[in-house]
């Protein structure tokens, strides 16, 4: 898998507060549908982590397509080897994913941890989080990049005291060949998306040509 590049662009000052809405793009829906299947999800996990697990029942699903937190619909969240993995699909480039995932992981930890145990002298163990974004938008990015929560901090001095890293994997056709090779379903999804874009482009061109011809005929009729 390609070496990740860090994205440390500082967010511009913006005090406008908007309520986030759940993304209902067809690409996201197809991704959730395909990888809500345990067998497909395990194949994707093995491809990303270069592992070879065989039993899909080892996946403990935390949330699936109906999980919405602050208007954010995540795609797939599950526990494997006591680690919590959050897999999300994005069809548009979004530098705010680390902040969104911070909201989400805090919500999940609240569900997993007994609040009373936080006041005891015993250390409360929690699953280590892992954040993966599968990106297939039109904005060109490398095969593997990183988005960091600290990029959003204003007037940051020294090392950040809080950090969250989202690994972004480009799953457009022609990217991450090794990853695609080890997960046939992901490869087929990328091919389907490429074909859908091609088909949509062709349909738009046909509609445009028909409109142009119709306009020409109307103009010609007026001149006769």
Task: Locate the predicted segments by residue.
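Elongated, amphipathic alpha-helical interaction scaffolds
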Residues: 2-224
């Amino acid at each position: 898998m390609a070496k990740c590049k860090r994205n440390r662009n500082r967010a511009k000052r913006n005090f406008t507060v908007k309520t986030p809405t759940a993304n209902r793009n067809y690409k996201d829906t197809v991704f959730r549908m395909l990888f809500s299947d345990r067998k497909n999800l395990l194949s994707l996990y093995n491809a990303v982590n270069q592992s070879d697990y065989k039993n899909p029942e080892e996946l403990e699903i935390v949330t699936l397509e109906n999980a919405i937190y602050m208007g954010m619909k995540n795609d797939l969240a599950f526990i494997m080897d006591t680690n919590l993995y959050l897999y999300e699909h994005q069809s548009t480039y979004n530098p705010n994913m680390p902040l969104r995932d911070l909201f989400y992981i805090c919500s999940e930890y609240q569900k997993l941890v007994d609040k009373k145990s936080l006041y005891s002298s015993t250390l409360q163990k929690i699953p280590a989080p892992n954040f993966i974004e599968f990106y297939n938008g039109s904005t060109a990015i490398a095969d593997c990049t990183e988005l960091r929560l600290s990029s959003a901090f204003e007037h940051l001095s020294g090392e950040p005291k809080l950090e969250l890293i989202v690994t972004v994997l480009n799953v457009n056709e022609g990217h991450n060949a090794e990853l695609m090779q080890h997960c046939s379903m992901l490869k087929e999804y990328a091919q389907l998306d490429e074909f859908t874009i091609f088909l949509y482009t062709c349909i738009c061109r046909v509609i445009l040509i028909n409109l142009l011809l119709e306009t020409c005929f109307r103009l010609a009729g007026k001149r006769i």
